[in-house]
């Protein structure tokens, strides 16, 4: 399993189990995706703690008033065996704007909305709502 899929799966499973936080190995890609999720309001926050190896990233999950997880569904689109690339005018709108897509561009990892505004295409990593 690739690291992005593992990251998304850990968040999905922790949300289903109603955990307050989830710990995982840190990486720059995971930190970039987590920052996008914080900016868009899907998770509360995250922090990276250094250890003797690569570091530990702790993600604090977000729930609504009824106790439901803020992320209803996460889909990994581009995988190591099947890469999916999109142009800036073909970035999908997820759930009529209620969700978001995560794109890896030449300027870094960003939301689909940011990539469209900057007219950047790239690899469509995931969609969520």
Curated annotation (Swiss-Prot):
Originating gene: rpsH
Assembly notes: Part of the 30S ribosomal subunit. Contacts proteins S5 and S12.
Assigned GO CC terms: ribonucleoprotein complex; ribosome
Pfam families reported for this sequence: Ribosomal_S8 (PF00410)
Coiled-coil residues: none
Designated name of the protein: Small ribosomal subunit protein uS8
UniProt family annotation: Belongs to the universal ribosomal protein uS8 family.
Domain of life: Bacteria
N-terminal signal peptide: none
Keywords recorded for this protein, A-Z: Ribonucleoprotein, Ribosomal protein, RNA-binding, rRNA-binding
Chain's role: One of the primary rRNA binding proteins, it binds directly to 16S rRNA central domain where it helps coordinate assembly of the platform of the 30S subunit.
GO MF entries: rRNA binding; structural constituent of ribosome
SUPFAM superfamilies, per the entry: Ribosomal protein S8
PANTHER family: 40S RIBOSOMAL PROTEIN S15A
GO biological process, one term: translation
